[in-house]
Every structure is written in structure tokens, then in C-alpha cells.
């Protein structure tokens, strides 16, 4: 009999908004309902949890009985669309208390939704959100740049990166330019 392993959370991947926006491939790892759902990021790694930092520029409360909040978080490369509702009451309360504009750090699950006309929308289901300062945002940009470049350096050598190439036709130079542009906006 195999010993029960302790529950381990998946690492939260750092990803820029412009890369997450291009994400289209989602899959379930396993057959049961508790199996995790992953996305393959265009830079070549699977993720079911992401860590983002940016400026909360907009927040909107929606619903009457099933209240939830939508928001926009902007990083140097684009916009993340975030949501928090009754499925994560602490995250919803955290988001409700933050007044834009504010630098925020968010851990959440990437969510893909295909519209009737075939467009794919990507949002982040918030697990936690906190106000941070500009220095934290700048450090996140540096860390995210490093992790993105590491994924691109390994591109084509892992199953996930080969799947990304198949699904997206990823051109690493495009993402290297995104990293360069993001770094140019950091104040060190």
C-alpha cells in the first residue's frame, strides 16, 4: 500500500498580462471532479495558480443575491481581469476593501471562457489579494521577467513547452521583447 502524501499546493506561476491574455489551452489532470485544471502558458509551462502584481485600476460590485466583484489589474504589459465571489469569501472581502488605484498582489486561478462567437476570455479567480507598494511591484516585474526567460530558455525541451508550441506556435523572441519592454518600465 502506498503511503498517503501530504497535500501540496501547486506553485503560483508568475506571468505577465500579455502572456496570460494569449492563453487558450486548458485541461484537467485526472478523471475525478477534484482533479486540478491547468492552462498551458505560451512560454511553455502548465499552471493552475498564478501570482500577479499590478495596479488595481477598476473595481465593480455585481449581483444582488450572489454578490461578486470584478476588477482590472494592470502590469507593464497589459491588463488582468480578476473576479472574487462567494466561492472565496475572504478574497471577496479583501477586494471589497481596496479602493483603486492601488498596487495589489494577487494569487488566483486562471480561468478560460469561450464566448458564443468563439473568442476566448481569460480571467483570474482571486484566492487572495493585498495592497502592496511600488517596490514590490517592481520586484515582481524582475522576478516575472527572470521566470519567463527561464521558461523560454527551456522551450522545446519539456512536454509542456512542446504542447505550447503545438497550441500557440510560440515565438520566443516575441516574449523576450515583452520581458524587455516590461523591464524598461521598472524604477530601480
Outline where the language-model segments fall:
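OB/S1-fold single-stranded nucleic-acid-binding modules
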Residues: 1-42, 162-188
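Short nucleic-acid-contacting surface segments enriched for D/E, G, S/T with interspersed K/R
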Residues: 45, 88-107
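A general secondary-structure signal for short beta-strands and their flanking turns/coil
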Residues: 47-49, 66-68, 103, 119-121
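Short, surface-exposed secondary-structure boundary micro-motifs
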Residues: 55, 109-110
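OB-fold (S1/OB) nucleic-acid-binding surfaces
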Residues: 61-88, 132
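Extended, charge-rich, solvent-exposed interface segments
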Residues: 97-103, 109, 116-188
Amino acid at each position: 500500500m502506498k503511503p498517503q502524501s501530504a497535500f501540496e499546493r501547486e506553485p503560483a506561476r508568475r506571468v505577465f498580462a500579455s502572456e496570460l491574455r494569449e492563453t487558450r489551452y486548458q485541461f484537467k489532470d485526472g478523471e475525478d471532479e477534484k482533479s486540478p485544471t491547468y492552462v498551458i502558458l505560451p512560454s511553455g509551462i502548465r499552471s493552475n495558480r498564478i501570482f500577479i502584481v499590478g495596479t488595481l485600476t477598476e473595481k465593480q460590485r455585481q449581483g444582488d443575491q450572489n454578490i461578486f466583484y470584478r476588477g482590472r489589474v494592470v502590469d507593464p504589459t497589459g491588463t488582468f481581469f480578476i473576479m472574487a465571489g462567494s466561492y472565496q469569501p475572504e478574497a471577496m472581502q479583501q477586494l471589497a476593501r481596496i479602493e483603486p488605484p492601488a498596487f495589489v498582489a494577487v494569487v488566483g486561478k486562471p480561468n478560460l471562457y469561450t464566448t458564443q462567437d468563439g473568442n476566448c476570455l481569460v480571467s483570474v479567480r482571486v484566492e487572495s489579494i493585498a495592497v502592496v507598494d511600488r517596490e514590490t511591484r517592481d520586484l515582481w516585474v524582475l522576478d516575472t521577467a527572470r521566470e519567463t526567460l527561464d521558461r523560454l530558455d527551456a522551450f522545446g525541451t519539456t512536454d509542456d513547452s512542446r504542447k505550447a508550441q503545438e497550441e500557440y506556435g510560440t515565438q520566443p523572441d516575441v516574449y523576450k521583447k515583452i520581458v524587455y519592454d516590461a523591464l524598461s518600465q521598472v524604477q530601480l
